[in-house]
Amino acid sequence: MKKNYYEMEVSSKNASELFKNFSFELGVEAIEEKENSFIIRDEEDLQNLEFAFIEFQKALQKKFNTKIDLQISKSIKENADWIEKYQKSVEPIEVGKFYVRPSWKESKKELIDIIIDPAIAFGSGHHESTNMCLKLIDKYAKDGATALDVGCGSGILSIALKKIGLKVAACDTDIQAVDASIKNAQKNGVKIDKIWNGSIADANLAIRNMDGEILSENLNENKNFNQSFNKEFDFVIANIITDVILILQNELKNSVKSGGILIISGILEKYKNKILNVFSDMNNLEILQNGEWVSFVFKKG
């Protein structure tokens, strides 16, 4: 073990989840999530990682034609067994009927157990937007219904939906997130019914099973998927940044059955009215707010 290690704290007011996901694409194996940032530690210099984040910021700004906030601070610290220290600092959380915990913590018998290890996941339930999503799943998701998780990340929301009896489809534009969702579902003893790498409109691309194997290159060839979901869902949830929600607004609306529920989360308070305006053709049932983060519940028809 080297005498010192490097620490980098990364924060973004409007793209935190994207930078977290990108860190795993770069090969980062563990992060520590804080309220408004995340920390990366390594015994090797993190200069190349910093450069990659800055280039990723530029790419996001070009793609979404908007300013992407990014703050990076670095330090050198005396080495210690920080992985063990970090694990001890991660506490389970109770959200409605769900109990989200890392694998090294004990379960609670009276609650629905969800195991997510922050070291390998893009979301562990501690972030305000994910926390609100779990509360809304607890309240609005119905046993036997069909669900779509858009931007599944760690798979935490898909796992919650499966554990209360829904048929679940999930997608993410990041292949690392798809793989993480598959692994986390296996760890939790559930199977996401169908999962693909891409957005809502890419459901006709390669479909993966829980072993990560491609089932079909064409969704229309998969009769079980079509019979179960018909491309419209009783319950759709999207916990992603505002800019992506705005890009996907029509696809999100079209993916909800008449009388179905759409949950939008990952939205900063300053974009609250914009989201309400964009989805004004749906019935707004509820708005939750936790700190600067806002979640919306809409009903179609």
UniProtKB/Swiss-Prot annotation:
Pfam families from the UniProt entry: PrmA
Function field: Methylates ribosomal protein L11.
Catalyzed reactions per annotation: L-lysyl-[protein] + 3 S-adenosyl-L-methionine = N(6),N(6),N(6)-trimethyl-L-lysyl-[protein] + 3 S-adenosyl-L-homocysteine + 3 H(+)
Gene3D superfamilies referenced in this protein's UniProt entry, alphabetically: Vaccinia Virus protein VP39
Source superkingdom: Bacteria
Principal cellular location given in the protein's record: cytoplasm
CC per GO annotation: cytoplasm
EC number(s) recorded for this UniProt protein: 2.1.1.-
The protein's name in its UniProt record: Ribosomal protein L11 methyltransferase
UniProt keywords, alphabetically: Cytoplasm, Methyltransferase, S-adenosyl-L-methionine, Transferase
Family per similarity comment: Belongs to the methyltransferase superfamily. PrmA family.
GO terms under biological process: methylation
Classification via InterPro entries: Ribosomal_L11_MeTrfase_PrmA, Ribosomal_PrmA_MeTrfase, SAM-dependent_MTases_sf
GO molecular function: protein-lysine N-methyltransferase activity
Cellular compartments annotated: Cytoplasm
Binding site for S-adenosyl-L-methionine: 130, 151, 172, 239
NCBIfam families: PRK00517.2-4 (NF001786)
